[in-house]
């Protein structure tokens, strides 16, 4: 069968490539054409447009690049029409993808399947109308999305979470502490891991407070998980003259050797939980308490970390915006390092999260459902 996929950013490229690999096993004659990236291209098929030429986030960047944005929309529509796939598969990236869903469904009558739901449970809930109209099947990777969509009388399939898959096959899963510190020239002291984000603005806002708070725990060494694409020189402006180390491309290995972690919100909070490392979730943004109150008003959820969202209760402490202070981080870090009951309680919460996430196999489960559904038409 013929498959057209659209992924508009790096994470989508990764998830779509895994899905393509699984689709080939279900359908050895699969033909692919796609908007995506290098990982998708490595699975075979035709790359029509690289996501690096599409990644305009926010009102101003879109406005400044409106000609390119409109060109990409026209190109995608005409290419889908010419290829006329058996199914259009969309991966997150809702601003662009919901336009394509409408076009494929209303103009071409092509089945539309969505892998990885847009986060409409957090903001822009009005997008549910377009999803109900134009998306035939939604494959979710977050279990709490099921009741959200049920509330809107729309049935979705939870297929598992890709992070569980990544954890299950990660290398060095049995690595010893001595081996890790020797390879990375670290001290023979327990580790507090610092995961300060993936973008320079995030790191600049979060890392200094993380270092200040964690430095109080002198029996521990501080180790930063360096983000991909960020140079060591950038980090050195924050750690120069301080007893802080950094490792690159070893985040999972660092976490599993750590006694605790300070983590910015995002997938990293879930990865830390799956590896059973106690954590404090930290996130700084401009605007202080006013921005925080506005942020909480706009968001439709009680929590920002995936761990707490999946558990539907507070498992990990979230120190956001004006609550993210050196003193608050020190207090919470002290609890998860030195209070056995607190550590035990958090690990029990992690176990409940892991139970709700289920077993590995998210892309494989989605691929089976896609192929079976299209063949049944």
Model-found features: residue ranges?
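Nucleotide-activated sugar donor-binding and catalytic core shared by glycosyltransferases
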Residues: 1-377
């Amino acid at each position: 069968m013929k498959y057209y996929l659209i992924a508009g950013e790096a994470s989508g490229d990764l998830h779509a490539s895994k899905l393509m690999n699984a689709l080939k096993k279900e359908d050895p004659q699969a033909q692919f054409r796609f908007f995506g990236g290098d990982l998708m291209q490595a699975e075979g098929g035709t790359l029509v447009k690289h996501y690096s030429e599409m990644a305009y986030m926010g009102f101003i960047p879109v406005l400044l690049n409106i000609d390119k944005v409109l060109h990409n929309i026209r190109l995608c529509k005409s290419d889908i029409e010419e290829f006329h796939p058996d199914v259009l598969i969309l991966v997150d990236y809702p601003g662009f993808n919901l336009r394509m869903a409408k076009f494929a469904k209303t103009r071409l009558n092509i089945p539309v399947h969505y892998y990885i739901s847009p986060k409409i449970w957090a903001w822009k809930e009005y997008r549910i109308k377009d999803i109900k109209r134009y998306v035939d099947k939604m494959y979710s990777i977050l279990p709490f999305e099921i009741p959200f969509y049920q509330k809107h009388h729309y049935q979705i399939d939870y297929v598992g979470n890709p992070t569980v898959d990544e954890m299950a096959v990660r290398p060095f899963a049995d690595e010893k502490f001595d081996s890790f510190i020797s390879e990375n020239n670290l001290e023979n002291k327990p580790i507090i891991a610092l995961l300060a984000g993936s973008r320079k603005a995030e790191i600049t806002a979060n890392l200094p407070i993380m270092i200040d708070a964690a430095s109080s725990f002198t029996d521990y060494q501080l180790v930063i998980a360096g983000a991909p694409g960020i140079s060591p020189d950038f980090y050195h402006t924050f750690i120069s003259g301080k007893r802080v180390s950094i490792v690159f491309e070893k985040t999972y290995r660092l976490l599993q050797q750590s006694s605790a972690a300070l983590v910015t919100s995002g997938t990293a909070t879930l990865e830390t939980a799956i590896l059973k490392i106690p954590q404090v979730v930290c996130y700084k943004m401009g605007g202080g308490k006013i921005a925080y109150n506005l942020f909480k008003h706009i968001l439709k959820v009680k929590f920002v970390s995936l761990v707490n969202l999946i558990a539907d209760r507070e498992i990990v402490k979230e120190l956001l915006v004006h609550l993210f202070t050196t003193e608050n981080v020190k207090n919470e870090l002290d609890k998860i390092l030195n209070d056995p009951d607190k550590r035990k309680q958090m690990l029990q919460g992690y176990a409940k999260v892991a139970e709700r996430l289920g077993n590995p196999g998210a892309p494989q489960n989605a691929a089976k459902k896609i192929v079976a559904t299209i063949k049944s038409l």
